[in-house]
Amino acid sequence: MTIPDVPTQTLPDEGEIGFVHIGSLTTEAGAVIDDVHIAVQRWGELSPTRDNVVVVLHALTGDSHVTGPAGPGHPTGGWWDEMVGPGAPIDTDRWCAVATNVLGGCRGSTGPSSRTRDGKPWGSRFPRISIRDQVEADIAALAALGIDEVAAVVGGSMGGARALEWIVGHPSRVRAGLLLAVGARATADQIGTQCTQIAAIKSDPNWQGGDYHDTGRTPDAGLAIARRFAHLTYRGEVELDTRFGNDAQLDEDPANGGRYAVQSYLEYQGVKLVERFDAGSYVVLTEALNSHDVGRARGGVRKALRSCPVPVVVGGITSDRLYPLRLQQELAEQLPGCAELQVVDSICGHDGFLVESEAVGEMIRKTLLLAGSQSAGPGGAGPGSRKGTTRR
């Protein structure tokens, strides 16, 4: 992967969104994406020695807006509000939290809805990308900001896949990591469910081969169906049955064409996503998840994991049916730097990494202890040595 040198740029003001130009990016597969911009936000001050950066990596339909209210450029409030801020697990009195919108996304970073130099949206011309490409773009953006090494990378789901690629592909650039609700590679079950979501979008007549952006017709129905199916994999089976059972939606009768309560709930989730997300980005990012394999071109998963020295905390959720606990157990067993496998007992399924704030906050705090930084924040004196870890 080739990323040309670019001039150093400046971090945006706290909580504001900035756009870092990284030039052209050559993907793992050899495609060239010209004129790439990566959206960046930060909370907390960068220390003089630039040693206190914690990179927060979002999941599939997330963005750089980790914390804070909705506003211009942010159609929703922060997706991990309780994790970042003064006194929070990522304590911004000490750490500088930095988040990007992933390459291929639709919240400020270059993706299918972005316009190319010819003034037209990328659309179907946007190439397939991998999780590895996303990480390379993030690293290039940070380098343009003068940040060559980070204290930690933390992320769940697709963010966890990005964190894993960070530590395996660039162990000298990161001092610790939190790998949450993720595995070393995509499983057949994940690929199957995710390919079905892509098919739902592409079967919408308004998809138009991916070149719909300037036509006034968007594949909203296909995207909503994809989200409904995906949302089932995000929540726990027991949780859904406890909340909805086989109940009818209020004032409706399924026997007479009405809806079930769970059906109404899933339709609502689909509508919410359509209001804030681009179908082309959903396809591109889902394809990247399908191709996730940390062992690709590294001698296989086992060799790739066992060669990674970075201290990590691995977190899993008992009811996660998208990334079952066995996948986190594999990471914990194969990563030499794994200090702890933390298992969250939750009925909330995969989304437990977003809603089980107390347990996730504890994992983040332990990860930052592993980072070994003795920086006191903006006036700190620089990092200490990495702390020793024990295998679980």
UniProtKB/Swiss-Prot annotation:
Keywords: Acyltransferase, Amino-acid biosynthesis, Cytoplasm, Methionine biosynthesis, Transferase
Gene Ontology MF annotations: homoserine O-acetyltransferase activity
Alphabetical list of Gene3D superfamilies matching this protein: alpha/beta hydrolase
InterPro entries for the chain: AB_hydrolase_1, AB_hydrolase_fold, HAT_MetX-like
Domain of life: Bacteria
EC number: 2.3.1.31
Assembly, per entry: Homodimer.
Function: Transfers an acetyl group from acetyl-CoA to L-homoserine, forming acetyl-L-homoserine.
Family the UniProt entry places it in: Belongs to the AB hydrolase superfamily. MetX family.
The protein's name: Homoserine O-acetyltransferase
Organism: Mycobacterium avium (strain 104)
Gene: metXA
